Regions:
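Residue-level marker of positions within ordered structural domains that often coincide
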Residues: 9, 68, 94
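A short, mixed-charge helix-start or loop-turn motif at secondary-structure junctions
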Residues: 49, 70-72
Length: 135
């Protein structure tokens, strides 16, 4: 797993959750209360299924066009960033219970995957994405 794949904001915890955190003697005390949702084998199996999500040539071209548009700026999307965008779009399609990626999947993850890589605000990244037409 790549912890730098996306920039996500979880927001602030509720007041009661923050109070509970303040009352703990150790900032790790609550970790022992967490329950896992998937085991290691299930995660690896899902990663394999995500790898099998098909991306048509037209969607690959859309990815390349998006990358080209970012590269008109000072810090364009790297090839590694482009691969991350592809993988995130595949994962999003998988979560939507589809075996193929649509341009909407790419758009759904674009800002979270790309904005922090190219040094633009979320609004600027959305504007950049809207300049690229889907063929």
């Amino acid at each position: 797993l790549d912890r730098f794949l996306m920039r996500l904001s979880l927001g602030y915890p509720s007041r009661s959750a923050e109070k509970l955190l303040l009352q703990q003697n150790s900032r790790y005390a609550l970790i022992s209360t967490l329950k896992h949702v998937f085991n290691e084998q299930e995660i690896l199996a899902m990663q394999q299924l995500v790898n099998q999500v098909h991306m048509a040539d037209a969607v690959l071209e859309y990815l390349l066009n998006l990358a080209d548009e970012t590269r008109k700026k000072q810090h364009g999307l790297s090839t590694r960033g482009l691969l991350a965008l592809k993988k995130a779009a595949q994962a999003f399609a998988f979560i939507q219970q589809r075996s193929f990626v649509t341009p909407d999947d790419v758009q759904a993850v674009f800002v979270a995957v790309v904005a922090h890589r190219i040094g633009l605000s979320e609004a600027e990244t959305v504007q950049l994405m809207q300049q690229v037409h889907i063929s």
